[in-house]
Amino acid sequence: MHYQEQMESLMLGEERRRGNYTRDVDADADEGVNSPSSFPNSPDDSDRRSSSSSSRRGLSKHYKGKSQSFTTLAEALTVEDLAKPENPFNAKLKQRRESPHCRRLSGCGGASERNLSVHDVFLAGNDRPPRLSGNRPPPRAQTLSAAHISALLTRT
């Protein structure tokens, strides 16, 4: 089978599936063109085989139709139809990152947004360094002199 014949059979099968098929079968017979259904591997032949056999394997039993990631220009009525739908999970993540609660408690941005000094950590009664996000190394521990510690203790 030639490449041109294969392409014609695929195009005709696609038109039939969409319901746009307008060619006359008798005209095809007069021209000497084989009908697409006579080709052994035509889309029409595979449609008939898949509908007749009830045992389908893999994703094919769950997935029917085309991917929703792409829209054909012929089916789009407005520009909004061409836009990819937003994933609700990504929208929620974006909303969380932009919330003021996230910035205030720095649960999303890490310790760098808090700008805590060693004195703030010591006065808060927390002897552990602030938790860092990402792959940054922990802050270097600063040694406090005895005079500095006694001055801090007398303030509280």
From Swiss-Prot:
Chief location of this protein within or outside the cell: nucleus
Source superkingdom: Eukaryota
Subcellular location: Nucleus
InterPro entries (alphabetical): OxStress_Response_Reg
Entry GO terms, CC: nucleus
Keywords: Nucleus, Stress response
GO BP field: response to oxidative stress
UniProt feature, compositional bias: Basic and acidic residues: 13-26
Claim: Nucleus is one of the keywords in the record: yes
Region (Disordered): 1-67
PANTHER family xref list: OS08G0516900 PROTEIN, PROTEIN OXIDATIVE STRESS 3 LIKE 3
Role: Promotes slightly the tolerance to oxidizing chemicals (e.g. diamide).
Protein name, as recorded: Protein OXIDATIVE STRESS 3 LIKE 3
